[in-house]
């Protein structure tokens, strides 16, 4: 369904024109249900010869009005052509109506942008809607790696995007600090602790002492172990330096390891420009009784029963047995099978624990969005069923899937990090190319599409590198404005001063094309927020940068298109208003992506 663009900022040309289209439709089709009118969309045309924008209004109204779309479109054309802002209206295809606006209407977009400043593109679409976005939630068992990086950037940009669309957003990180992986981390840290205090014990010798083998052998645990040794000396080992009974050391090492690993993760996130408002602990959630409360609530609704699940599809696990378990009737809420909440031994399943955590989030949110790796596909329907059951359908649950990232340099996969032992760390990536390049590149493709992160391409100063291309456009804009300050005085080129420029000088096809692009930004924000696709904003940045560079290049051949005319102040100010509007829109878009626009290229 089309977004209700009446909620867009009042400076949005698409919002104002859509209101006029809806009024015309009501006039042409009296008594049309309002829910049909609210679905009317107004989209930028891809081909300028088809006008500036197109609407589906006639096609939406055809069925309820029991009339042909072309007939309604013809009447809409007459109504819309009579509007003072419209230069041309024509029916097209099966019932579209294309609109061409008068140049002064497009020229006014620059003024709207200058007046809106950093608020350009923001709307009230999501006003009153509380959205919880959970992202990263990396296990605190090692450094953040490139896989975490994509989810972190996508989640953070999505949160920014939803805020720009008017939602109240909570950014949350779930600390998986209870379970077998934390146990494995604790044992691995203790092994490094023994080595730090001088005990000669290899991984092969220590591994048999652990519950499930020595799973984490990266060098990143050595500083953690050293910190523990500095604080506790040899007190956590036997007199001869050998392994002590876990009752002596386990809880101390677990606590220290978790604290330091989370501190390292927070530092990595800060370096990536990410800040969460909430860090929720799995251990605290389990201790709070929320899991049992959620299970009890489902039981009170008659949604639990004792039963035996069908055997897993595909290869049968050797240890699988048909055992009675407490099952949740998730199929009643769209899942493909009922799900186990309690095992035959009375312990909760991981899914049950996760339900308790999501129920906790749902207490303060209208929509829950989890940003997860692509291997969590089977998770969506079961959790959506649980949230729907617990909240009587009042809280929505969505998942944004992030595909894997392959890092290459010189055409070859990047060597694994020695520090991490098994993967390319986030710090490796940031040290190599910088925060803004990492963030923008991670957002150049849809989250569920696989990505190759080419370290050479990301730092190349060519038009084929979208990071450079977009930043260069902003830097060029700022360079023009600085030159204008020297030529005409700083007071002359402020946004306030440029608002009074005679914009009729912006009349060339290439200038009007840029203005069309600028006019579409608020709509792009809402469309991206509705689709939960922040990569659309990166695409918008690339398209706007392309339009600007095309205008710059045309100015080399056609002097009338140049931005500065020392002997023609009026024309210069009009061009500068456009340049300032481009820079401002790029800044607003990059802010959503969490990227800092550069003032000059170095």
From Swiss-Prot:
**Stored Pfam families:** Arg_tRNA_synt_N, DALR_1, tRNA-synt_1d
As one GO molecular function, the record gives: ATP binding
CDD domains in the cross-refs: ArgRS_core
- What reaction does this enzyme carry out catalytically? tRNA(Arg) + L-arginine + ATP = L-arginyl-tRNA(Arg) + AMP + diphosphate
Which SMART domains does UniProt cross-reference here?
Answer: Arg_tRNA_synt_N (SM01016), DALR_1 (SM00836)
UniProt keyword Nucleus present: no
Listed EC numbers: 6.1.1.19
Span of the annotated motif 'HIGH' region: 138-148
Where does this one sit in the cell?
Answer: Cytoplasm
Q: Which InterPro entries match?
A: aa-tRNA-synth_I_CS, Arg-tRNA-ligase, Arg-tRNA-synth_N, Arg-tRNA-synth_N_sf, ArgRS_core, DALR_anticod-bd, Rossmann-like_a/b/a_fold, tRNAsynth_Ia_anticodon-bd
Among the GO biological process terms of this entry, one is: arginyl-tRNA aminoacylation
A GO cellular component annotation in the UniProt record: cytoplasm
Keyword line: Aminoacyl-tRNA synthetase, ATP-binding, Cytoplasm, Ligase, Nucleotide-binding, Protein biosynthesis
Assembly and oligomerization: Monomer.
Family, per entry: Belongs to the class-I aminoacyl-tRNA synthetase family.
Write down what this protein is called: Arginine--tRNA ligase
**Organism from which the protein derives:** Gluconobacter oxydans (strain 621H) (Gluconobacter suboxydans)
């Amino acid at each position: 369904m089309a977004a209700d663009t009446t909620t867009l900022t009042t400076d949005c040309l698409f919002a104002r024109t859509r209101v006029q289209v809806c009024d015309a439709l009501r006039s042409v089709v009296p008594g049309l249900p309002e829910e049909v009118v609210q679905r009317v969309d107004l989209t930028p045309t891809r081909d300028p010869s088809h006008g500036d924008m197109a609407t589906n209004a006639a096609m939406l109204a055809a069925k309820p009005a029991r009339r042909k779309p072309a007939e309604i479109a013809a009447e809409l054309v007459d109504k819309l052509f009579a509007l003072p802002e419209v230069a041309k209206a024509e029916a097209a295809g099966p019932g579209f109506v294309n609109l061409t606006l008068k140049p002064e209407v497009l020229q006014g977009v620059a003024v709207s942008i200058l007046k809106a400043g950093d608020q350009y593109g923001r709307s009230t679409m999501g006003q009153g809607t509380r959205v919880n976005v959970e992202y990263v939630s990396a296990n605190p068992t090692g450094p953040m790696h490139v896989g975490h990086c994509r989810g972190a950037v996508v989640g953070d940009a999505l949160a920014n995007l939803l805020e720009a669309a008017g939602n109240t957003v909570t950014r949350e990180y779930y600390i998986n600090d209870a379970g077998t992986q934390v146990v494995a981390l604790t044992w691995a840290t203790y092994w490094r602790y023994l080595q730090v205090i001088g005990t000669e014990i290899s991984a092969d010798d220590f591994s048999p002492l652990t519950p499930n083998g020595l799973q984490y052998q990266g060098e990143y645990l050595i500083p953690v172990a050293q910190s523990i040794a500095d604080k506790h000396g040899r007190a956590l080992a036997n007199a001869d330096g050998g392994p002590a009974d876990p009752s002596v050391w386990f809880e101390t090492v677990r606590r220290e390891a978790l604290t330091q690993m989370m501190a390292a993760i927070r530092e990595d996130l800060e370096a990536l420009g990410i800040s969460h408002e909430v860090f929720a602990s799995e251990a605290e959630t389990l201790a709070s009784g929320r899991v049992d409360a959620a299970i009890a609530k489902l039981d009170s609704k008659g949604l639990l029963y004792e039963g035996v699940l069908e055997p897993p599809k595909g290869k049968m696990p050797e240890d699988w047995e048909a055992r009675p378990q407490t099952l949740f009737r998730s199929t009643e809420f769209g899942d493909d099978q009922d799900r186990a909440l309690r095992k035959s031994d009375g312990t909760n399943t991981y899914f049950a624990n996760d339900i308790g955590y999501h129920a906790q989030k749902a207490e303060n949110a209208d929509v829950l969005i989890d940003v997860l790796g692509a291997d969590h596909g089977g998770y969506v329907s079961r959790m959506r069923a649980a949230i729907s059951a617990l909240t009587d359908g009042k809280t929505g649950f969505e998942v944004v899937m992030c595909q894997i990232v392959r890092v290459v340099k010189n055409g070859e996969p990047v060597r694994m990090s020695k520090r991490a032992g098994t993967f390319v760390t986030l710090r490796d990536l940031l040290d190599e190319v910088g925060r803004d390049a990492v963030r923008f590149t991670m957002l150049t493709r849809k989250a569920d599409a696989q990505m190759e992160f080419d370290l050479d391409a990301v730092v190349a100063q060519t038009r084929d590198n979208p990071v450079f291309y977009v930043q260069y456009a902003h830097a060029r804009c700022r360079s023009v404005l600085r030159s204008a300050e020297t030529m005409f005085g700083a007071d002359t080129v402020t946004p306030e001063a440029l608002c009074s420029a005679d914009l009729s000088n912006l009349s060339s096809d290439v200038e009007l094309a840029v203005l069309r692009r600028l006019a579409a930004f608020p709509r792009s924000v809402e469309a991206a927020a509705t689709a939960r696709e922040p990569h659309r904003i990166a695409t918008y940045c690339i398209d706007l940068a392309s339009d600007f560079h095309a205008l710059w290049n045309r100015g080399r051949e056609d002097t009338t298109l140049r931005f500065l005319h020392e002997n023609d102040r009026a024309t210069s100010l009009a061009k500068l208003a456009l340049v300032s509007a481009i820079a401002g829109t790029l800044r607003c878009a990059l802010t959503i992506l969490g990227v800092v626009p550069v003032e000059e290229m170095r």
